[in-house]
């Protein structure tokens, strides 16, 4: 029971009303000054796009998908304890800059034994990303890996998931996020099968890339010409 006269802050009620247990990200709807957050079970796969993002965009549009917003640069910074505890346990703590928005994300360990990657995801917007990063560092977390991508998000009316095109320094990828049945059906419609599914993170994919290209930088960022 709450002690008499002790009321939670007003934004707590707004946050409580905004909890959504659903598939799919709604981060694109965040405004940095809103105390809004989501809790969800994220289910997704990646697909490598050897023919490039433009060919994939045309393919999505042929199947009724439309971009929900402009192509946008996202800069992600993950944080971990000095021991690497989060990475070792399959968890992730990430601060994302996307346009004028800052988004903080926690992801839990992925469920084992599935061809899709399913994990708990909690997201919220913050108004000052630099200040939030300092708070994390004061709590003992340190920057662990940074990566960039140009992302375009697509949705088909009435469908249960979203598709994103990611143009990264190591190639172009498509992410399909939604219920497992929707992922499998959509991947098949686009010409992909389970053998094409990638459940690795961009951090893992970049580690594999660095083992072949030893001179590339530590972080996955676009290099100036």
Language model: regions and residue ranges:
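Internal alpha/beta scaffold segment
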Residues: 183-190
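N-terminal strand-loop-strand beta-hairpin
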Residues: 39-160, 196-225
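A contiguous pocket-lining binding segment that forms or flanks enzyme active sites
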Residues: 163-170
């Amino acid at each position: 029971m709450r002690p008499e006269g002790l009321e939670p802050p007003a934004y707590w009620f707004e946050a409580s009303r905004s909890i959504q247990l659903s598939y799919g990200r709604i981060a694109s709807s965040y405004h940095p000054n809103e105390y809004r957050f989501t809790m969800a079970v994220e289910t997704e796969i990646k697909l490598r796009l050897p023919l490039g993002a433009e060919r994939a965009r045309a393919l999505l549009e042929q199947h009724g998908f439309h971009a929900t917003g402009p192509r946008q640069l996202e800069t992600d910074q993950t944080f971990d304890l000095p021991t690497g505890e989060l990475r070792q346990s399959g968890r992730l703590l990430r601060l994302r800059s996307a346009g004028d928005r800052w988004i903080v994300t926690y992801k839990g360990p992925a469920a084992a034994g599935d061809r899709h990657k399913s994990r708990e995801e909690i997201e919220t917007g913050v108004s000052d990303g630099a200040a939030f990063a300092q708070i994390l560092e004061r709590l003992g977390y340190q920057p662990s890996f940074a990566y960039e991508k140009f992302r375009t998000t697509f949705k088909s009316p009435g469908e249960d998931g979203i598709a994103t095109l990611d143009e990264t320094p190591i190639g172009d990828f498509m992410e399909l996020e939604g219920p497992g049945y929707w992922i499998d059906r959509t991947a098949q419609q686009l010409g992909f099968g389970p053998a094409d599914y990638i459940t690795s993170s961009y951090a893992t994919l970049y580690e594999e890339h660095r083992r072949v290209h030893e001179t590339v930088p530590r972080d996955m960022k676009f290099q100036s010409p």
